[in-house]
């Protein structure tokens, strides 16, 4: 498996960190329903009355690292990662302006 991009989701969340791994001319489309957001982030959003966009721009929402790989390598990558990590297929890379688009 060739890792084409890697992003550590820290301060700046999805919106600031994911685009750093992308070349010009593509965007990362992240499906928010592709995993269960941990309860602590839901509680923080509700208690602090924080809008969803701000949550994804400030926190990692339970995702510590994002990898970009060839779609043909998804199964092999997931199998390898599940040997010691919790992992999810979050979305895909598409043509577009460099950004992280959450849908």
Short names for language-model regions:
Residues 1-103:
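Glycine-/charge-enriched secondary-structure boundary and capping motifs
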